[in-house]
Amino acid sequence: MELETIEYNKSFNICENGDSKGVQLTFKNISYKVENKNYNKNKKEKNKNKIDPEFVNLDNKTENSNEKEITILYNVGGVIEKGELVALMGPSGSGKSTLLDILAQRKSTGKITGQLLVNGKEIGEAYKKYCSYVTQEDVLLQTYTVFETLKFYADLKLPGVSEIEKIKRVEKVIEDVGLTLKRDSRVGGVLAGGVAVTGLSGGEKRRVSIGCGLITNPSLIFLDEPTSGLDSVAALQIMKTLLNLTLKGVTVICSIHQPRPEIFQLINKVMVIIKGKMIYSGSNILEYFESLGYPCPNNTNPADFCLDSAVEIGEGERYTEICNQWENKWENQLTNEIEYPSLNVDIPKTTSWVYQYWILLNREWRGFIRNKGNALSRVITAIVIGALFGSCFAGLKESDADVQKIMGTLFFLTTGLMLSPFSMITLFLSGRQLFNSERASKIYHSFPYFLSMITVELTIEFFVTLVEVTVCYMLARLRMDAGRFFFAVLVYSFIHSLSTFFISSLANLTGTSDLTFSYASSLSVVFMLFAGFYVPTNELPRAFGWLHWVNPAFYGYSSVVINQFEDLQLKCTDEPCKFTNGNQVIEYYGIEDWTRGGSFGVLVAWATFFYSLSYFALHFLHREKR
């Protein structure tokens, strides 16, 4: 067979004529096993009750099996040619999504055996470079437009490509997925906090997800249930879009449940899996089922008929016989398969962390600015809280009579800034799904992502803190000389940031808002109780005296107290005078052994600790498991 000569642009693995260079994908004897988590439990029950294990159906193991491992796929094989639209079909739990994940090299758990060949050769590191995977859920940034979303992927997945070429590629993909009229429309959805952004329909979002996978012009694209959750019209549009891609040489492989007749007619090849075994792969499935004694009645959806017949075969006595017959037939067909030349292109390098950080930082800032409700509410809240604190303690004097009020002002300002990041719990967790999806696609590293998110958050928090502290300090008439005021702003900014890292680390460790709020609120009560305001540190019971040493709030609070009272002369309003100068106040509260710089240094160390904990929890925990 004579192949068309297509010149490659090696810089980012697309053909000069805009079409993808096709490949042949062959998989042989693919088996997949997972650990049976109930094995030990079943073993104990077996020994206890003396149950005969012969009742177990070894062809359809479940979690109640007495085997150490559960086999999900059994020696599955097949050939997928260039430019085919292939549908993996089967009832729920048959193994079609598992096979799709294995072919896309996205399976991160279990034990996989068998061979996966591209153009007759074992796959290597380059395999994922010319494959794309589209998940069942459309995980997209709600405030970005269609163009911005695809441009984001182009920036991170096409290293070494000029800006002009990236834009051309994005415009081409937008045209390919039929979203030219929606180019500048926002994706839309519900933001953290419940704010709804008007945007695309479900079918249009699915096409954006497909477009993200097409940015690198892949030779293979895998889709998990691309029509799931869509109405019949949107589902048909999606499948027509995929069919158009196959005409350009892209091989499309998708799992699909029960397509309507119009969709079924678009499919080039159907692979049917029942109970982990392949019973058919080809383009004449109705004829094959008829040869097995299952003719398709008139006026019946062929897809429904095929699925019903497959289920009946799986539950019948001929299941093993039919599976073995198909396996032998497929092995004979394999000897006559067409050999394509191997794909021999340079593997594009990934973008640098610095570049990833810059692109992600740009996206974070746009996301914040476009979420106007969140931005405005945070500024207004800072002004209101600062005004409330300042008004309650307005016009304080540098006298011994107002020492307690000054201490209260400093304490409640500290605790207010520590508690304000609680509102960010949903924000941290809402971005987690998007991060996991993008990380699984390997478009950026977790460190640039985390750093960009924290950079934006800290910048916003510094501004909010500056507003709140300025309003409060001016109304309460606390020390406003430049050095001490800006040091107070710096300390309060780190208190705010430390609390953000603390909440972020708990959110990344627990993965749920309920647990995060429960742990954070409990620990915050402990932090406030032993911060040194309610009970001076030198008056704490011995059993609890050590707690203030491991309390970040203590170091932040002591810093601003020392900053306020150090070398301050106090006026005596009544006799006897309890405090004549601020140093006596510092001594009374048991922090005379600390300096404002020393306390601030420990506060910075705590902030660094929670920053590191938050990052490592994000990087190593709650990864996408397939």
From Swiss-Prot:
It is a multi-pass membrane protein. Residues 373-621 form the ABC transmembrane type-2 domain. GO terms for cellular component: membrane. Residues 56-300 form the ABC transporter domain. The chain crosses the membrane at residues 376-396, 409-429, 447-467, 485-505, 515-535, 543-563, 600-620. One of its GO terms (molecular function) is ABC-type transporter activity. Keywords: ATP-binding, Membrane, Nucleotide-binding, Transmembrane, Transmembrane helix, Transport. InterPro entries: AAA+_ATPase (IPR003593), ABC2_TM (IPR013525), ABC_transporter-like_ATP-bd (IPR003439), ABC_transporter-like_CS (IPR017871), ABCG_transporters (IPR050352), P-loop_NTPase (IPR027417). ATP binds at G90, P91, S92, G93, S94, G95, K96, S97. It comes from the Eukaryota. Gene3D superfamilies: P-loop containing nucleotide triphosphate hydrolases. PANTHER family: ABC TRANSPORTER G FAMILY MEMBER 12-RELATED (PTHR48041:SF87), ABC TRANSPORTER G FAMILY MEMBER 28 (PTHR48041). This is ABC transporter G family member 8.
